[in-house]
Amino acid sequence: VGRVAGKVALISGAARGQGRSHARLLAAEGADIIAVDICEDIETNEYPLARPEDLDETARLVEKEGQRAHTEIADVRDRAALAAAIDRGVAEFGQLDIVVANAGICPMTAGLPPQAFVDAVDVDLLGVMNLIHASIKHLHAGASIIATGSVAAFMATAVNTAGMDGGPGGAGYAFAKQVVAHYVNDLARTLAPEQIRVNAIHPTNCNTDMLHSPPMYKAFRPDLQNPTREEAEVVFPMIQGFPIPYVEPEDISEAVLFLASDAARYVTGQQLRVDAGGFLKIKPWSGP
């Protein structure tokens, strides 16, 4: 029997990357999936986002695991449209047990207009809140909410550093992830009497389309005009404690599975870092 057998999971940003990986693993462990993605680009985010055919492929992979998939094209910035999409998915499957607020962008390009800050915050912070708050009415005791943060949330200088190297979008990304960490803490306290768990996962560099994009390469290698993947990967390990360039989406999915499963039934309000020791490089020990 799978670790989330008989459960229904809602995942935003599910068309590719970490979201697709989460959908596939949760399906392999017995969950039906409500997969949501915007499936179109956002102007200030200079790498291409997923397309409808990517979302279809996620559904195919879920069904290949023997589970049901309900797909919705929706923008997490639009709470009303998102709520309607979630309602349709829950109407089809009859319940909702797991919420994974995964959708995110990282418009790290120097010289972008201030709108890039707004877009990053709208997706990475308000989008998380919109998904979760549109889902709460469907949840019950034992349900699990998981928000995707970032190791940037723990960097004291993340906003300044990202703002310098990645423009206003990089600053917005770092700011949003910091507030997500605080939000998860406070929401976990709020929902504890209902026995609904709320946790955050904070990845480091992850091997997805977001990382492997010209704007991100440039953010890591501002000394080069048009850095290649190979040139960027030389400095990727500086973020981690381990001498590796990035973790894999599946590494994050295993953490999602744990937090979604009954193995974590008393785990709430946690900031789970899947960062290959990145936090240890930037934060001195200050006691438990």
Predicted regions and their residues:
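Catalytic Tyr-X3-Lys loop
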Residues: 97, 105, 113-132, 146, ...
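Conserved mid-core segment of classical short-chain dehydrogenase/reductases
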Residues: 48-56, 104-119, 157-165, 169, ...
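Short C-terminal tail/terminal secondary-structure segment
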Residues: 256-257, 268-288
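Catalytic loop of short-chain dehydrogenase/reductase
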Residues: 105-109, 146-193, 204-207
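Amphipathic alpha-helical dimer-interface segment in Rossmann-like NAD(P)H-dependent oxidoreductases
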Residues: 123-143, 152-154, 188-189, 193, ...
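A conserved structural motif in NAD(P)-dependent oxidoreductases
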Residues: 225-230, 240-252
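Short, small/polar-rich loop/turn modules that mediate ligand/substrate recognition or access, typified
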Residues: 192, 197, 267-269
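Canonical Rossmann dinucleotide-binding motif of NAD(H)/NADP(H)-dependent dehydrogenases/reductases
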Residues: 2-40
